[in-house]
């Protein structure tokens, strides 16, 4: 991968970069590995997906295509890579806003058996829906309104959901943590969740997207 035709890139804290496009044919549900080589200094704290349920392998020194990762340190997180954007002919996608239920809580490490994985597999097997992909934007411990882990849904919706390319629909499957964390002491949580959902729906419809809600 290159960034502006350069084989290396420097990121400031909180900064995002998009690589140059690369020609690489992918199949639906194909697993993909990305190797990140750090320069002279490894970051003290690397941004990561805490609940990836997928193993990363860490070795010292610069990796090469023949690098042996079998003796590397294992970590069940993804590091640094926020997303992969894939171009396809007549392809669309459904983005899912969710918490740990969507992120993969209870699924099997390295098996890719979250509910969104089964959903994507089912869509790909039906000729009528095989052109539709599924984008899992679930974050364990996430809330819609406030608190929880990472930015709440009302903050990250525009970036994480509407910022995706090629969308045709959105599924909103979040709110459990708001009710469980604040509902007992805050009787307004229900009404404020409804207001947040209505705002998500409005924004989605403005983009011409279908918006589906999941029961919580």
What is each stretch, according to the model?
Residues 1-97, 107-109, 128:
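N-terminal secretory targeting modules
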Residues 43-44, 104-105, 144-146, 179-184:
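Extracytoplasmic/secreted cell-surface and envelope-processing proteins
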Residues 91-117, 140-143:
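Catalytic nucleophile-elbow at a beta strand-turn-alpha helix junction centered on a G-D-S/GDSL motif
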Residues 93-98, 102, 132-138, 168-173, ...:
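Structural recognition of the beta-strand scaffold that forms the well-ordered cores
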Residues 110, 117, 121, 125-127, ...:
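Alpha-helical cap/lid subdomain in secreted, periplasmic
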Residues 126-144:
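Mobile, glycine- and charge-enriched loop segments
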